[in-house]
């Protein structure tokens, strides 16, 4: 039996103290190990606010291609308006850069601001508070960075923003002799997301509403035929706070995780996959929370679902869905 230990996050948040910043705040974040989702002016969803987090996709506001939890060497800055009362809506802008291989001192293998950094640049502009909010975000993903969640077809490593591609090289063309050599693909991704939420003033049988929509495009060279070059996702989350008793919540989220919308060569994919999540959270004691949940995915393989039939016909009748459940227990001390 092996036991491994490590630090998940190491970073420092430093507010800028200046008498001129009376109505505004400016915070700098820097560290050798941090996530880009920890350096945002606001979280653009109320679905998981103070509640359970069951599936990663719903926990990331339904747009994991932008809020992809990229972890590595990071620096960021958050600008935010100050409000008279806590929870009042405020405008904020945040920017951060995360190099997932920033801890490697060799620029051939990693480092900061190199071709091999696996860098993520995320910028968010938002306006919101406790009751409502809206945010627009953009993430530039260097080659080697992923979109985190989606169909199996969309998340295939050979299709997902790889840094290298195999190119055939003739050594003796007259003899038809040659071999594949590795060549930089110069790929990167451009990811956009728009989110909004509304929370009722009183808890009970009126739910909060959270929505999200995202689009992505992968650019570069050397794409395999039929590989995805564009994708999108959308999400709707409803959450009832204190619906059974104080501290007990009910949530339902549904939508379509990241799925391909365009293939290299101008082909149209059949990559759609619907997801539904339902959970009920019970505050058993002051320190213990129990959350039973169920979830369903209609076509998690996406475009690969056709591989289940012998002819691999995208117009065929191949089906494959998943229904699952989870009981989450949280202990706080």
Q: Residue locations for each model-derived region?
A:
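Short, small-residue-biased leader/transition segments that mark boundaries at the very start
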Residues: 1-11
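Extracellular loop and loop/strand-boundary signature of outer-membrane beta-barrel proteins
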Residues: 60-63, 107-111, 177-182, 219-225, ...
